[in-house]
Amino acid sequence: MTTSELPARTSPTPDVRNGIDYKVADLTLAEFGRKEIRLAEHEMPGLMALRREYADVQPLKGARISGSLHMTVQTAVLIETLTALGAQVRWASCNIFSTQDHAAAAVVVGPHGTVEEPKGVSVFAWKGETLEEYWWAAEQMLTWPGEPANMILDDGGDATMLVLRGAQFEKAGVVPPEDADHSAEYKVFLNLLRERFETDRGKWTAIAESVRGVTEETTTGVLRLYQFAAAGELVFPAINVNDSVTKSKFDNKYGTRHSLIDGINRGTDVLIGGKKVLICGYGDVGKGCAESLAGQGARVQVTEIDPINALQALMDGYDVVTVEQAIGEADIVITATGNKDIITLDHMKAMKDQAILGNIGHFDNEIDMAALERSGATRLTIKPQVDLWTFGESGKSIIVLSEGRLLNLGNATGHPSFVMSNSFSNQVIAQIELWTKPEEYDNEVYRLPKHLDEKVARIHVEALGGTLTKLTKDQAEYIGVDVEGPYKPEHYRY
């Protein structure tokens, strides 16, 4: 189908109350959301410590932050930390299924507002968006009244891509045509840019020139940043938050260890113990997946392309196999690679009857959902984000969670607050770095320095009741570090 054949797109209309524009599922859910936010604040010591440290300084004053990150209760605490430090914020979710509607409502109303007179932040997010609605919300999040956004906080790179590709196409004077190989989502993306090219040409260039920097939350988005940088297309500095140790080794592993089985249990309520499980990928996320499922008594196998990760899996006690070797016997299959086409249509047809298939990587192309939808298989929705797909030729069925998108956020509520406190503390620090020290950053991808990573960890060690050993001056000199840290070189692998 070409663009000219696509049905006319009807965009949502923002609601406006008390001067705040927004689009959420139900603003009356705000009270429930506020109760959960208060509970989460207790479990997010890093963010609360940053509020206490910087509240008087207001280091983000003047920052207009456009945020694209799962609109959860934990994200609400992040948003209100950014505003407590002086920033103005507009927000959208980075996934069509991950929004917690009560959290979105609470952020719009704000801690001191009411449903009738909200005093919070502009949010454009609700659970169960269509692709058209998702990209509409992304544009709203980037569209400020008056001056354009000057900071981006991203998860997965969609906000960054929208700005960079939009500016690139404006410079070229044309939005490229659709290609047969483009996904349905990329066609929606191009259609949005094509519409804006006709109605507001120059919009994305103005935003790109205004943005002082972007901070990126996740592996997939970081990969995009490095690709933009390598191609000479990154026109503002970026901080790779994902590779901060207190993010990647905690959010990616320990957070996944908690939220994967939560998503499987809420989605299917099947017994995990004794089942054969195939985990595709053994990075930090895959390690958390394998550990959680093995802890439930599952028999875990792992696929890997990297011999180092494969050796780790073997020494952790897991068989390392190929998808083709294991797919026919697995009761549960989870993708965690950050790559595409990990589970193909042929793989799905080879799966056991009523085997469970889910993804915990950022995008929905690890599982070839487009091929499944074209295959003629029939889809029966059991409940939201749980679908039974039946192949006519064999009569076999598979259970697909969250349409191949993040099952821990689609079928459950994502990582717990304490883990996200680590990640989001890094986000706040990174935003402060780029906003207050623009002269120190070129249009490249950076990581936060080690002493800031250790600062985040120290706060959370104390919150859990841990007591750190103190080096003597002689001991510090002996190993070549300062008494107060950093304690490891940048190349150290935790």
Swiss-Prot record:
Transmembrane region(s)? none
Which N-terminal stretch is annotated as signal sequence? none
A Pfam family of the record is AdoHcyase_NAD
Q: Which SUPFAM superfamilies match?
A: Formate/glycerate dehydrogenase catalytic domain-like, NAD(P)-binding Rossmann-fold domains
* Record-listed NAD(+) binding positions: 218-220, 252, 281-286, 304, 339, 360-362, 408
Q: Which UniProt keywords apply?
A: Cytoplasm, Hydrolase, NAD, One-carbon metabolism
Where is the protein found, in the record's own terms? Cytoplasm
The cofactor(s) it depends on are: NAD(+)
Which GO BP terms, alphabetically? L-homocysteine biosynthetic process; one-carbon metabolic process; S-adenosylmethionine cycle
| Principal location | cytoplasm
Textual note on the cofactor: Binds 1 NAD(+) per subunit.
Q: Can you supply one Gene Ontology CC term for this chain's record?
A: cytosol
Q: So what does this thing catalyse? A: S-adenosyl-L-homocysteine + H2O = L-homocysteine + adenosine
Reported function: May play a key role in the regulation of the intracellular concentration of adenosylhomocysteine.
Q: Which family does it belong to?
A: Belongs to the adenosylhomocysteinase family.
Q: What is this protein called?
A: Adenosylhomocysteinase
Q: From what organism does this protein derive? A: Nocardia farcinica (strain IFM 10152)
Instruction: Give the classification, highest ranks.
Output: Bacteria, Bacillati, Actinomycetota, Actinomycetes, Mycobacteriales
